[in-house]
From Swiss-Prot:
Region (Disordered): 568-600, 719-811, 854-883, 944-978, 1003-1027
Coiled-coil annotated spans: 47-134, 178-391
The organism of origin for this protein: Mus musculus (Mouse)
The protein's name in its UniProt record: Coiled-coil domain-containing protein 73
Biased composition (Polar residues): 591-600, 742-781, 789-811, 857-869, 948-964, 1003-1013
Matches recorded under Pfam families: CCDC73
Keyword Glycoprotein: no
Record keywords, A-Z: Coiled coil
InterPro entries: CCDC73 (IPR031650)
PANTHER family tied to this protein: COILED-COIL DOMAIN-CONTAINING PROTEIN 73
UniProt keyword Cytoplasm present: no
Residue spans of biased composition, Basic and acidic residues class: 967-978
Length: 1066
């Protein structure tokens, strides 16, 4: 640069030196500025490069962390897949064992195929209902558009009115301006008049002063005249000339006076005239003041009206904006619902395809079973012949058996019941089903010992729980809310097989356990229960095999039988179970005492492990047991008199098939009413041949965890004279749709449970008696049957007894259809078998709760169908929680409809509790996956939290009615789950289009919250290996909880969390 400067300077030597110096200085300044700019740019680049390097390092670290997380998730996914494969392998082996057992029966699969077809029809009906709901939604949208159009028209009219008001206001302001101008003119005129008055007053004063001076002059003149007259007399002559002159002056003065007087008169007249004008002006001024006041008042009123109108306009504009926002939200919700509807249709189509595939598999299996059935029939006939000879021997040998044999037989029976549950597919045998088919052929067949290998295979998965007699996986009827506190009478494998054949006749019922001739063998534990404990009663029936469908409906009867002295007369149509239920409700309302007598208190303190005390109690009742056995034998020998007059024993009742029509009428009435929940339930099974006496054991059902231990023995410890009081829970405030029948004990002695057995023949469960002390808020839609689960907890109850008494009401449940098919559901919860060796009645399995939310549109919730994955597993969060309501758990069983998880009521609020708690192990040998969290709540506290927002319930029901969330391992997409969770909170979305589901009970909003993560009650459930599966489920839950917490805390990482969630769930 300096060389260039030198060259330029040498080249310009001819220029002046001053000019060259200035140019050089200018160039140097330019050079310095360019250098500074270059340095600054270099600094900026270096800073940017350092920042970029730091960002790149951070991004590399994040990518590495993401890769590590991805690898960890892949490892977890592979481990889960391996575990799932292992579990599926075990399940496949078990299913193969079950299929070998299922090949023994042909009729079941025929009915299974029919049921599948009916389910397909039911799915078609659900599709129709979905289409109807879509059409109703379209109607709603059109109505909303019409409302918006009308609103716009009203807005335009309002704007027009505002414009007119503004015009009126402008006219009024113009008139007001004119009035003001007139007022100003009036003020000016008044001022001028005042000035004129002042001038006139000054003139008047001047004239008065002049008049006064003239008067003085007149006086002086008069005096002078007098003097002049006096002098004139003396000087007439002299002053004659002077007088003439003075007279002339006097006349002139008089003329002046006259002129002045006239002027004064004129002035006075003018003054009076001016005063009158002043008064007129004052009057007009007052009038103008009044007008001005009126105008000002009118202006103030108009201003106030304008302010009000402006405020109204602003409020209307705000309302317009809110309405627009609501319309947008409704449109978005409608779009989301349409998307979810399309997804639901897709899932439904997938289900239809799966059902078709399963139907094909079942048809193939039927073809193979038809071949084996002929061989088995021959073997069966031989066994029947042998049983005829051995039947009466066992009746004679019954007194010789001791309690140890009965315990072993009970163990076998319970295990056979459980194996029968799995052999018959999703048809599960009830714990409380102590119906006895006394057909001689069946007895002989039962007495026939089967091959030891097959029975050992059936009983092997359950040997762990056989010692403590934990038959918790024994099914219970969906309408039966409790188990018998007594031992299930022993059952051989043939009896179980016969139960399977009878179960096929009524595929929608888990047929009661037929303990046909083992009654005699169970003298110590069976017959003592009939007579001494007074809570059992026999049902004598001659119904044929075609009538078994109706007779088996008595499994779900909500018969509360606290006193056994009730001869059942089926000719009566009146409900007789209400006074006793009132008594039980009274006891439950005072559940702090537990019961009215010491046996109840002692019973409430029994834990599931107290088996020895129960057996001792049985031994003390052996004398009464003998009497009960004798009465039972008398009933068998005297079958016809028992049918006519009722059994002589107070614990025996007769059931006449001829009154089925009358009972059908009672059943229809009971379906429309919200009957209370039953404490005892009748399970009867009709023999295929006449002459068979059916010994039906009423089953104790705990009213809730709070009253389960208290009310279980309301009939157990009472004497035979404590006659028929039925614990109907008297609701404090029943809804108009609910009927809580309240009858006195005297009325019940007359009616005596006839109607319930009658309804049982017509295959309708009368009702589960429900303790509605504010715990159930049943909202019944039109013609629908609501299910009201009860979740209350007792402070006295230990946590090991995780009893869920969310018992659906039978008369209102969707499981009861016109054909009278009923499903028995697993009651895997409560294990109060410490009473006499069998599970007491309070347990409610997840399958029972599962169907509590099914709509009547579902085809009576067949337990047989393997395609029952369409059972609704709906989240219904009644409270806004961070944990979303779409957490799903994969069932192990191929029949998830029976076994799948139901998140009851407040599933979402209770999930965090589930994540924090450990699973409750009811015994040392049994792993219970269902976990119940029942807070220790006093009934007053529960009553306070009963009433919920019916609109929120209806929205929850609407959500439930539309969405069928499947318990597949795949789960649903996150968007669907979020949409289903959001629809619950939609306050503005109309709910009329949705078919009214049974609402989740408002008890679910109370302190008792139930979460059941229940896998299939397969034999794997009783195996020690189930701990691994349980720990796996808990690990999944913990992972999901962590991911959800990340989702709530770190919003930018939501995509990552969603992918991780989907990977884990898949």
């Amino acid at each position: 640069m300096e060389d260039s400067f030198n060259t330029t300077s040498s080249a310009s030597t001819f220029t002046l030196q001053s000019s060259s110096e200035t140019m050089v200085s200018i160039q140097l300044l330019d050079f310095r500025t360019s250098l500074l700019e270059a340095l600054e740019e270099l600094r900026m680049r270096r800073k940017a490069e350092t920042q970029y390097e730091e960002q790149i390092a951070k991004i590399i670290l994040e990518t590495q962390e993401l890769k590590w997380q991805k690898e960890a998730l892949q490892n977890q996914k592979e481990a889960l897949i391996k575990q799932h494969k292992e579990a599926m392998g075990v399940l496949k082996n078990q299913l193969q064992m079950k299929m070998y057992a299922l090949e023994e029966e042909k009729g079941k699969y025929k009915l299974a195929t029919e049921i599948k077809e009916k389910e397909i029809e039911g799915l078609k009906e659900t599709l129709k209902t979905l289409q109807v709901s879509q059409y109703s939604l379209q109607k709603k949208v059109s109505e909303m558009e019409q409302k918006a159009h009308l609103y716009h028209l009203a807005k335009e009219d309002y704007h027009k009115q505002l414009n007119e008001i503004e015009k009126y206001y402008a006219a009024i302001t113009n008139q007001f301006g004119l009035v003001r101008e007139n007022h100003v003119k009036l003020e000016q005129n008044v001022q001028e008049a005042i000035q004129l008055n002042k001038r006139l007053s000054t003139l008047n004063e001047k004239q008065e002063s002049e008049i006064h001076s003239l008067k003085k002059e007149l006086k002086k003149a008069a005096s002078e005249l007098i003097k002049s007259k006096v002098t004139c007399q003396h000087k007439m002559e002299e002053e004659s000339i002077d007088l003439i002159i003075k007279e002339q002056k006097y006349e002139e003065l008089q003329e002046r006076l006259n002129m002045e007087l006239e002027v004064n008169k004129k002035i006075n007249e003018e003054i009076t005239h001016i005063q009158e004008e002043k008064q007129d002006i004052i009057i007009s001024f007052q009038h103008m003041q009044q007008l001005l006041q009126q105008e000002t008042q009118a202006n103030t009123e108009i201003d106030a009206e304008l302010k009000v109108l402006r405020e109204n306009n602003q409020t209307l504009e705000r309302d317009n904006e809110l309405q627009r926002e609501k319309v947008k939200e409704n449109e978005e919700k409608f779009l989301s619902l349409e998307k979810e509807h399309e997804r639901a249709l897709g899932t439904w189509k997938k289900h239809v395809e799966e059902l078709s595939g399963e139907m094909n598999v079942i048809k193939n299996e039927l073809s193979s079973l038809r071949e084996t059935h002929a061989k088995l029939q021959e073997h069966y006939n031989k066994l029947c012949e042998q049983k005829k000879t051995e039947e009466y021997k066992k009746f004679q040998n019954v007194p010789e058996l001791n309690n140890e044999n009965s315990d072993e037989l009970t163990r076998k029976k319970s295990e056979n019941i459980i194996t029968q549950k799995y052999n018959s597919g999703p048809e599960i045998w009830g714990k409380n089903t102590k119906s006895f088919c006394l057909d001689t052929e069946y007895r002989e067949e039962e007495k026939k010992d089967l091959p030891v290998g097959k029975t050992a295979e059936d009983l092997q998965p359950f040997e762990i729980s056989a010692k403590s007699e934990i038959n918790t996986m024994v099914s219970q009827d969906r309408n039966q809310s409790g188990m018998s506190p007594h031992r299930v009478l022993c059952l051989d494998k043939d009896a179980t097989d016969q139960e399977q054949t009878s179960d096929v006749t009524d595929s929608r019922k888990s047929v009661t356990v037929e303990v046909k001739d083992k009654l005699c063998l169970e003298k110590a534990s069976g017959c003592s229960e009939f007579k001494s404990l007074n809570n059992f009663f026999l049902v004598v029936d001659e119904s044929l095999e075609t009538e078994m469908v109706r007779l088996e409906g008595t499994e779900g009867l909500g018969l509360l039988h606290s006193g056994g002295d009730i001869p059942l007369d089926t000719r009566s149509n009146k409900a007789s179970s209400n006074g006793m239920s009132n008594e039980m409700a009274h006891k439950r309302n005072y559940n702090t005492d537990g019961s009215e007598s010491n046996p109840f208190k002692q019973q409430s303190k029994l834990l599931p492990a107290d088996l020895e005390n129960a057996t001792e109690k049985e031994i003390t009742n052996q004398d009464q047991t003998k009497a009960g056995l004798d009465s039972f034998l008398d009933i068998k020998l005297n079958l016809d008199p028992c049918k006519k007059h009722g059994l002589q024993d107070s614990s025996h009742v007769t059931l006449d098939v001829k009154h089925q029509k009358i009972k059908q009428m009672v059943r229809e009435e009971s379906q429309c009413s919200t009957e209370p929940r039953s404490c005892y339930q009748l399970a009867s099974k009709a023999p295929q041949k006449p002459g068979g006496t059916i010994a039906c054991a009423a089953v104790v059902s705990p009213l809730g965890p709070s009253a389960s231990s208290d009310n279980k023995l309301t009939a157990l410890k009472k004497s035979e004279n404590s006659i028929n009081t039925l614990p109907t829970a008297a609701k404090p405030a029943p809804s108009p749709a609910e009927r809580t029948t309240r009858t006195n004990t005297n009325d019940i002695q007359n009616s005596s449970l006839r109607n319930h057995l009658g309804a049982s023949e017509s295959s309708v469960s009368v009702s589960d008696f429900q303790v509605n002390q504010g715990d159930s808020h049943t909202s019944q839609a039109k013609g629908l049957k609501t299910v009201v689960p009860l979740t209350t907890s007792s402070e006295k109850q230990p946590p090991s007894e995780s009893q869920i008494t969310e018992t659906p009401k039978s008369g209102l449940s969707s499981l009861v259809d016109v054909t009278g098919r009923q499903c028995m559901w697993l009651n895997n919860r409560d294990k109060t078998e410490a009473l006499n060796g069998i599970l007491s009645g309070g347990t409610c399995h997840e399958g029972q709760l599962e169907e509590a939310h099914l709509s009547p549109a579902t085809p009576s919730a067949d337990s047989v169908s393997t395609s029952a994955r369409s059972a609704f597993d709906l989240p219904s969060p009644d409270k806004p929680e961070k944990t979303p309501g779409y957490i799903k758990f994969v069932p192990l069983s191929p029949w998830p409809k029976v076994n799948q998880t139901k998140t009851v009521g407040t599933a979402t609020p209770s999930i965090p509790l589930f994540l924090k708690e450990k699973t409750v192990d009811l015994s040392g040998s049994r792993v219970i996956t269902p976990v119940t969290f029942c807070k220790n709540v006093v009934l007053d506290d529960t009553r306070k939290n009963i009433e919920s927002d019916p609109t929120s319930n209806s929205r929850a029901a609407d959500t439930m009615s539309n969405w069928s969330i499947h318990l597949d391992p795949k789960g649903q997409p996150r968007e669907e789950r979020n949409a289903t969770a959001q629809t619950v909170y939609d306050s503005s979305f109309p709910t009329e289009h949705v078919k009214a589901e049974p609402l989740i009970s408002t008890v679910q909003q109370s302190h008792s919250q139930t979460v059941k993560v229940t896998d299939s009650p397969d034999p794997l459930t009783f195996s020690p290996g189930n701990n691994d599966w349980q720990s796996l489920v808990m690990n999944r839950l913990t992972e999901i909880e962590k991911l959800l917490s990340l989702e709530s805390d770190n919003q930018p990482k939501r995509r990552k969390v969603e992918e991780m969630l989907d990977n884990i769930i898949d």
